């Protein structure tokens, strides 16, 4: 008598959602107009609104992404 064969499940990797690169402006409240960039050579993060020309700059490290720069800008706006 033989053993029953066991079906092996094939591991299908889950797709990771992409991080957003365009955000809402905390100054003029337009949607998808803020673009955040991180200059790793300068160790600075920049956020610029294309409608109201508002801008923000902050210090960055090697792990900083665009969402980190945007959240720092929103935190700075909430403090005022």
From Swiss-Prot:
Protein keywords: Metal-binding, Nucleus, Transcription, Transcription regulation, Zinc, Zinc-finger
Binding site for Zn(2+): 25, 28, 49, 52
Gene3D superfamilies: 2.20.25.190
Compartments where found: Nucleus
GO biological process: transcription elongation by RNA polymerase II
Matching Pfam families: Zn_ribbon_Elf1
GO MF term list: RNA polymerase II complex binding; zinc ion binding
Location (main, coarse): nucleus
GO cellular component labels: transcription elongation factor complex
General function of this protein: Transcription elongation factor implicated in the maintenance of proper chromatin structure in actively transcribed regions.
Similarity-based family: Belongs to the ELOF1 family.
This protein's name: Transcription elongation factor 1 homolog
Species, as recorded: Encephalitozoon cuniculi (strain GB-M1) (Microsporidian parasite)
Lineage start: Eukaryota, Fungi, Fungi incertae sedis, Microsporidia, Unikaryonidae
